[in-house]
Amino acid sequence: MEKSSSCESLGSQPAVARPPSVDSLSSASTSHSENSVHTKSASVVSSDSISTSAENFSPDLRVLRESNKLAEMEEPPLLPGENIKDMAKDVTYICPFTGAVRGTLTVTNYRLYFKSMERDPPFVLDASLGVISRVEKIGGASSRGENSYGLETVCKDIRNLRFAHKPEGRTRRSIFENLMKYAFPVSNNLSLFAFEYKEVFPENGWKLYDSLSEYRRQGIPNESWRITKVNERYELCDTYPALLVVPANIPDEELKRVASFRSRGRIPVLSWIHPESQATITRCSQPMVGVSGKRSKEDEKYLQAIMDSNAQSHKIFIFDARPSVNAVANKAKGGGYESEDAYQNAELVFLDIHNIHVMRESLRKLKEIVYPNIEETHWLSNLESTHWLEHIKLILAGALRIADRVESGKTSVVVHCSDGWDRTAQLTSLAMLMLDGYYRTIRGFEVLVEKEWLSFGHRFQLRVGHGDKNHADADRSPVFLQFIDCVWQMTRQFPTAFEFNEYFLITILDHLYSCLFGTFLCNSEQQRGKENLPRRTVSLWSYINSQLEDFTNPLYGSYSNHVLYPVASMRHLELWVGYYVRWNPRMKPQEPIHNRYKELLAKRAELQKKVEELQREISNRSTSSSERAGSPAQCVTPVQTVV
């Protein structure tokens, strides 16, 4: 029986709030960023309420005031809408890198916050509750040994956070109950924090992506392709967007018959069209051929129409993301793949990318070897045993084959896996990133994510498990993480071709889990509409686009007409240390890399200004020389100017 994919009860009415510092969401071993927006907790008596004149005469008031100051120093910087749910003093964080440290552990409705004043600067650990996968109790009341009684939180971003409580303090139970309640609000019929957080930015990120504008940018509609509203009420396919681009000569009634032959009704629809050859990338789900090898005349005619829309080629390639053995096995479940006998002039290619369960296990193995410490002596063999980079290679190689077929072969392609919302999204978005320089800009990449991932129904709620305590759910899988990893691999091979930097990619992944923004909530466009997310939550793009200097690559040069062909070879791929191993302070650069980005951007702007000034000077001299040369009363001796 299929699990419900509804995202009902995710939120209630929002409260006004302000943006957080991204630094506060990504630092496990350093003090909190000074730029963090925060407010003082209302639960702490304000020191301003004690008069200075009274303090001069009352030692007790003096002690109370100092105590309040210390309490404020130990509390987290709160976002509006955020409030403290529990606080435990004299808790020990078992840091795997720098050793045990004692301090105060605070749970709010948004974050887990630990601060120790024993070190200088103070030791701070700050993690959003959304990143927590599960919470486990360690030891019992009769446990012997130092730090043997406490809690361990297992996180979705590689970390494990372990805290020791004193049995006699009786704080563990309360902290555990509040973590289980607020880290998993969906399981407790509570709102995700995104519905409490509301901020107006200079730009509304929810308006960034407009499907009509994006299709017009691609030259759609044209004589071969039209935009249809057949799915306006999500009745054709509830996981597709309202507007679809389909062959112009296929009427809406036929689309419905095609939908009945495709898994989940996900018919082939256009993702991208080549501006010159008109070769296209279309995406869909598997055909429902079953073991009997059923056929659909409407589906065959539909793919023929896709092929005919491209006059440059009389062939079409069907890229099935799955290993062939998996595709064959799907026939027993009523699915399958296209027969080359039924689809004339079509060539079927299997890309051998494994399913969500294999990828989940691969990430689990990767986590074991990178956190908390790396075993140097067996590092390469351990990394190879996870198969993580092998999976990254296959995804990149598949996207590369698609891009090459469209660009060099001038041939249209159809891409699908089983349901068309996991591996298909990886392949189409990466191929489009290789083919179209627009998607390599910051805003263009945001549009790409909105279009190929969000509007076309990647099941973020199920794959990430926002606010859900069922950590062993078989639907969890790092599909989007793999996509971002592939993008990072491309930025390594083409360091000047992308407007965004590594910090941009890490920020997206951090907020994939944080539940601070509404961008990655729910499983489909229809569900986001029902939840009214654009009005009730803040878009991640609003936050990012309000401080673009943090996310801009100083080496970027516009290559809008260039097609990128990354090398999908194990020799050219590497583990993304900046993400997977970032919690280890020994693996961090001494200076945050995004600070260096800012310095380089400022330097580039300074040099560009000098170049412009020199160009104006040369232009002015050239104009003056021309005027003097054109005057009959003046004899001008040529002067060579060296700049």
UniProtKB/Swiss-Prot annotation:
State one molecular function term (GO). phosphatidylinositol-3,5-bisphosphate 3-phosphatase activity
| Primary location recorded for the protein, binned into one broad class | cytoplasm
Q: Where in the cell is it found?
A: Cytoplasm; Early endosome membrane; Cytoplasm, Perinuclear region; Cell projection, Axon
SMART domains assigned to the protein according to its UniProt record, in alphabetical order: GRAM, PTPc_motif
A GO cellular component entry from the record: early endosome membrane
Q: Enumerate the UniProt keywords alphabetically.
A: Cell projection, Coiled coil, Cytoplasm, Endosome, Hydrolase, Lipid metabolism, Membrane, Phosphoprotein
Chain intervals with Polar residues compositional bias: 1-12, 23-40
PTM: Phosphorylation at Ser-58 decreases MTMR2 localization to endocytic vesicular structures.
What segment(s) does the record annotate as region Disordered?
1-54, 614-643
Membrane topology classification: Peripheral membrane protein
PROSITE patterns xref list: PPASE_MYOTUBULARIN, TYR_PHOSPHATASE_1, TYR_PHOSPHATASE_2
UniProt family annotation? Belongs to the protein-tyrosine phosphatase family. Non-receptor class myotubularin subfamily.
Can you name this protein? Phosphatidylinositol-3,5-bisphosphate 3-phosphatase MTMR2
Organism the protein comes from: Bos taurus (Bovine)
